[in-house]
């Protein structure tokens, strides 16, 4: 947290709490696995956003040959990220259909969908922005604590949301010194996964709030402070960070 502190002229810091959000698609998660008894080929119809990932998981966990299973995502309504992960019901309907040699259908009701669909956005973010007397950004330091729920989610892992928050905290600004510590904390809640921007809304809210606070601190127009620190077109591609 001392990164860039020797150059510090002033420090703007705050603590931000982001509330948990739940995707709620009009169509609940639904799966049908059909079987061709003559060829022993399975076809899974899933309201998923990631049919390729679902097929890979079926091959991995059920030991089914790649030419034996086809995953089809028909035209469905919005998923908003909540249908972009593997759910155990997808594996279960395929396993039962393969075992019993009969079609299997599973449709979640609204209550089940609300309780078991992956969620997002529950973080506490401690951040401080250091800038000089002219308003030039010197460094950004942060701690990101993410409530990731009871278990990880395939294939993104439970760290997806908190890591994305940390990765986007700098926004479009020239900040040469950046440090972020991320801690993922388990709880008795549903797992977190991709949903509506995956870390970007929280990151943007934090950095832009700090910039507004800094503008008030140095009595500068917030738009001018942003223009003074924004990455210019002639500075692209811009990458000054060392990732560890």
Regions found by a protein language model. Name each.
Residues 1-8, 12, 243:
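Single conserved hydrophobic/aromatic residue that forms the stacking wall/gate
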Residues 13-30, 39:
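Soluble metallo-hydrolase cores and metallopeptidase-like ectodomains found primarily
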Residues 25, 82-133, 192-217, 238-242:
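Glycine-rich and small/hydrophobic secondary-structure elements
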Residues 28, 38-42, 64-68, 100-104, ...:
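Short coil/turn connectors at secondary-structure junctions
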Residues 31-100, 196-224:
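Alpha-helical support elements that line or immediately flank enzyme active sites
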Residues 50-54, 59, 112-201:
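Gly/Pro-rich active-site capping loops and adjacent beta-alpha segments
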Residues 68-74, 101-111, 138-143, 175, ...:
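Beta-strand segments within the central parallel beta-sheet cores of soluble alpha/beta enzyme folds
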């Amino acid at each position: 947290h001392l990164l860039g502190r020797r150059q510090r002229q002033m420090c703007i810091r705050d603590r931000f709490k982001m509330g948990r959000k739940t995707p709620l698609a009009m169509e609940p998660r639904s799966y049908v696995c059909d079987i061709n008894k003559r060829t022993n080929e399975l076809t899974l119809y899933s309201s998923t956003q990631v049919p390729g990932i679902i097929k890979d998981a079926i091959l991995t966990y059920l030991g089914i040959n790649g030419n034996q299973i086809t995953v089809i995502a028909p035209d469905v309504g919005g998923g908003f990220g909540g249908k972009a992960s593997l759910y155990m019901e997808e594996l279960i309907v395929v396993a039962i259909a393969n075992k019993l040699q009969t079609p299997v259908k599973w449709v979640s009701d609204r209550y089940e969908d609300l309780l078991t669909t992956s969620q997002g956005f529950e973080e506490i973010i401690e951040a401080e922005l250091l800038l000089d007397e002219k308003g030039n950004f010197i460094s950004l330091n942060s701690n990101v604590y993410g409530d990731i729920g009871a278990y990880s989610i395939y294939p993104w892992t439970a760290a997806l949301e908190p890591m994305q928050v940390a990765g986007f905290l700098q926004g479009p600004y020239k900040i040469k010194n950046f440090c972020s510590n991320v801690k993922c904390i388990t709880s008795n809640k549903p797992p977190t996964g991709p949903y509506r921007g995956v870390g970007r809304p929280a990151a943007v809210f934090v950095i832009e709030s700090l910039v507004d606070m800094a503008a008030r601190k140095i009595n500068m127009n917030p738009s001018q402070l942003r223009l003074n620190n924004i990455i210019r077109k002639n500075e692209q591609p811009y990458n000054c960070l060392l990732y560890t």
